């Protein structure tokens, strides 16, 4: 059996491939993306619903069965250095598989992916001058 290593398609793997090929034109790097994140917030939809109910003067955040479903949806809010926000989410279909840490990782990655086009647009505008 052939052991063929497939190329990495994650952000760091792609950046390494760019460097290996000697490409040096201006670009956004994974480090640029991370450096642009000023703050990170995580919460579940259940926590959001409970806070919204509390602020509305109610102690009910929906039916108990909804609480289980809402607890499986994790949000990540990234505040960028300029104050702009991007969000990511992670939904778990099965309560038995829910893991808060994994949910936060997936939600953050999904939010981080939204920064690329924003910073790419900004770079292109600067290059166009």
Question: Where are each of the predicted segments found?
Answer:
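Domain-level marker for long, solvent-exposed, non-transmembrane regions
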Residues: 1-129
């Amino acid at each position: 059996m052939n052991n063929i290593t497939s190329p990495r398609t994650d952000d760091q793997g792609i950046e390494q491939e760019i460097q290996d090929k000697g490409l040096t034109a201006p670009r956004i790097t994974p480090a640029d993306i991370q450096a642009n994140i000023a703050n990170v917030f995580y919460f579940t939809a259940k926590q959001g619903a409970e806070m919204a109910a509390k602020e509305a003067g109610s102690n009910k955040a929906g039916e108990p069965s909804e609480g289980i479903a809402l607890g499986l949806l994790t949000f990540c809010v990234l505040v960028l250095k300029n104050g702009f926000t991007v969000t990511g989410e992670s939904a778990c279909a099965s309560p038995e598989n829910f893991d808060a840490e994994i949910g936060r990782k997936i939600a953050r990655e999904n939010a981080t992916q939204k920064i690329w086009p924003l910073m790419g647009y900004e770079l292109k505008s600067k290059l166009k001058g």
